[in-house]
Amino acid sequence: MLFSPPLQRATLIQRYKRFLADVITPDGTTLTLHCPNTGAMTGCATPGDTVWYSTSENTKRKYPHTWELTETQFGAFICVNTLRANQLTKEAIQENRLPALEGYNILKSEVKYGAERSRIDFMLQADFRPDCYIEVKSVTLAEKENGYFPDAITERGQKHLRELMGVAAAGHRAVVVFAVLHSAITRFSPARHIDIKYAQLLSEAQNKGVEVLAYKAELSAQKMELNEPVPITL
């Protein structure tokens, strides 16, 4: 995924009201960015960090600038735009960069499924193969080289795991993909210290046939690409 037009650089002043952030540009202008991330963003929103933002051509948007990346004072890149996780995963599947998800010729997005009336991020289909249901989660919480999900208690994430267990029980393929969007992370675990219920459900889901995958994105201010498998400890 190439950023076109190129991202612009600024310095973070503060994130507030969850969806907004004030930054100062190199010429001294203060801007308010849209922050497309509902999570705690622990370690991703430290005042003084470098922010990379995109600008929409939609003149009707109240906040035309979107916070895409954080470049920390320690040199790590973090993609804070959670919408990018799905885009990167879709691109990687279509370009056959995720071997575990190859061999399908149909990809559908936002398909309704499950007893709890959810929407799956992706469904893959092919002749003579079970349908493959894929839920994607964005991983940005880092403690040293360890990556964790979630960064706050997530009842929605718990629901998705229950739905995937139902998919597996029905004879379909069920997969959760953790898209690691932090350049310093080298391994992944569920955040048992934050949401014990989610961690327990993830282990239960794996035991009941749900596949748990983690891939790391190559990140820069110019492009992003999801391709590197990450070791998982449940």
UniProtKB/Swiss-Prot annotation:
Cited InterPro entries: SfsA, SfsA_C, SfsA_N
Gene3D superfamilies xrefs: 2.40.50.580, 3.40.1350.60
One Pfam short name: SfsA
Protein name: Sugar fermentation stimulation protein A
Keywords: DNA-binding
Family from the record: Belongs to the SfsA family.
MF GO annotations: DNA binding
Stated role: Binds to DNA non-specifically. Could be a regulatory factor involved in maltose metabolism.
Organism: Salmonella agona (strain SL483)
NCBIfam families with a match to the protein in the record: sfsA
Keyword DNA-binding annotated: yes
Positions of the DNA-binding region: 201-220
